[in-house]
């Protein structure tokens, strides 16, 4: 089968659109008064601060000193092949986490008093992520658990 120039152009534009699914980097993320931005109504977001079951995920918990736990989490996150660190503040990390086609935004907020790290992960594009953000946060939870306490 021989492709005509118009088909080649259409194919090239289609591939460009397919692989250019990063979307714009959100400018509304970050922590305000100990809170992360709420999830949108779409199911492609999870947050430990969400009140509805659709979006709710447990925060990361730790028993060791907050600074040690934070350093361990940072090591886990920075070591991920799919992660790019976007912002780092004391007790706050924001990363882009990539899949084959898409970019998701993940945030981590240290709550020293309660010995937890609040998490939020959301897809930039689309409506459903087929549970990808939740699975990824659970994977990070397992990696974050101290050695000997991993499930």
Model-derived features: where do they sit?
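Bacterial N-terminal signal peptides
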Residues: 9-18
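Ser/Thr-rich, low-complexity intrinsically disordered terminal regions
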Residues: 20-151
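Bacterial N-terminal signal peptides that target proteins for export
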Residues: 1-10
